[in-house]
UniProtKB/Swiss-Prot annotation:
It comes from Streptococcus pyogenes serotype M18 (strain MGAS8232). Monomer. Belongs to the QueA family. This is S-adenosylmethionine:tRNA ribosyltransferase-isomerase. InterPro entries: QueA, QueA_dom1, QueA_dom2, QueA_sf. NCBIfam families: PRK00147.1, queA. It comes from the Bacteria. Gene3D superfamilies: QueA-like (3.40.1780.10). One of its GO terms (cellular component) is cytoplasm. The keyword Magnesium does not apply. Pathway: tRNA modification; tRNA-queuosine biosynthesis. The gene is queA. Transfers and isomerizes the ribose moiety from AdoMet to the 7-aminomethyl group of 7-deazaguanine (preQ1-tRNA) to give epoxyqueuosine (oQ-tRNA). The lineage of its organism: Bacteria, Bacillati, Bacillota, Bacilli, Lactobacillales.
Length: 342
């Protein structure tokens, strides 16, 4: 298939720049790909789409304040680093600007030298491996000096950094939020659990590759980014029990889908505790092994995330649903509205 097969018209004013005041007040488009139906609803009604005995699977990763602004001590030139992933110890892969000035051995200071970074390797596309030095605990230093790395299509400053975290965010490590989870409130999750739905958590640390456009025409030539995932034995056992009892595995967001399907592909459809790196690319033709339904936000044209949704619900029907969402003025992307896919 061709990348352009997943293009659609999106007016720029539909790209949500700020979160709604109430997390669960966003709109929800409920689609059923077998019945070919679409229903306009609101997110707090997602509980009506869940049955007792189902499992609702959420990604509990927490976004790091991963954008750092500093300067080179020799030239006082301004430098921006965006932390991508922890490679080992105090070494991180980062995206650097301006990268051309940062050669191996270069040093960057942040916060009057409270945090120092030394370039130890150069990667392509402005990537660098840096080693940090600091006093105290790294995450605490980062919390005081770093800024939340909002996606490139959001131009307004975020008033409350916690609005770019899910209410169940726990495991530090992401460069972007698993945005399908931003709609849930603690109260809504309590109601869902009281209905007899199992709440299950996994971890996938979202990398910036999630925003990287597909740069090839032929999907088979696309090089998918890798992200770290983890599923505990307790979570795996709950999911096995749910499947055995005839319940559904309902994933919250594409990151949960990619984790579950990575594990399902690795263990021939079985659900086992596992951790590692995944670069799974789910596109039309893929046979789903674990996920029975899911919620997700509205994604960028020609993105791998639209391709993933199309793999589950069919390209033509998904693009029809997206056209409906545009006509009905749904809000798109990270702070936008949601879709529930049966």
């Amino acid at each position: 298939m061709n990348t352009n097969d997943f293009d659609f018209e999106l007016p720029e004013e539909l790209i949500a720049q700020t979160p709604l005041e109430k997390r669960d007040s966003s709109k929800l488009l409920i689609i059923d790909h077998r019945q070919k139906t679409m229903v306009d609803s609101h997110f707090d009604h997602i509980i009506d789409q869940l049955n007792p005995g189902d499992a609702l699977v959420m990604n509990n990763t927490r976004v790091l304040p991963a954008r750092l602004y500093g300067e080179k001590p020799d030239t006082h030139g301004h430098v921006e680093l965006l932390l991508l992933k922890n490679t080992q110890g105090d070494q991180w892969e980062v995206l650097a600007k301006p990268a051309k000035r940062l050669k191996v051995g270069s040093q960057v200071n942040f916060g009057d030298g409270r945090l120092k970074a030394t370039i130890i390797d150069e990667l392509e596309h402005g990537g660098r491996i840096v080693e940090f030095s600091y006093d105290g605990i790294f995450l605490e230093v980062l919390e005081s000096l770093g800024e939340m790395p909002l996606p490139p299509y959001i131009h307004e400053k975020l008033e409350d950094a916690e609005r770019y975290q899910t209410v169940y965010a726990k495991e530090n490590g992401s460069a972007a939020a698993p945005t399908a989870g931003l709609h849930f409130t603690t109260d809504l999750l309590k109601k869902i659990e009281a209905k007899g739905v199992h709440l299950v958590y996994l971890t996938l640390h979202v990398g910036l590759g999630t925003f990287r456009p597909v740069s090839v025409d032929n999907l088979d030539e696309h090089d998918m980014h890798s992200e770290f995932y983890s599923l505990s034995e307790e979570a795996a056992q709950t999911l096995r029990d749910v499947k055995q009892a005839g319940g559904r595995v309902v994933a919250v967001g594409t990151t949960s889908i990619r984790t579950l399907e990575t594990i399902g592909s690795k263990f021939q459809g079985d659900i086992q505790a596992d951790s590692g790196w995944t670069n799974i690319f789910i596109k039309p033709g893929y046979q789903f092994k674990v996920v029975d339904a899911f919620s997700t936000n509205f994604h960028l044209p020609k993105s791998t995330l639209v391709m993933l949704v199309s793999a589950f619900a069919g390209r033509d029907f998904v693009l029809e649903a997206y056209r409906h969402a545009v006509d009905e003025k749904y809000r798109f992307f990270s702070f936008g509205d949601a879709m529930f896919v049966n």
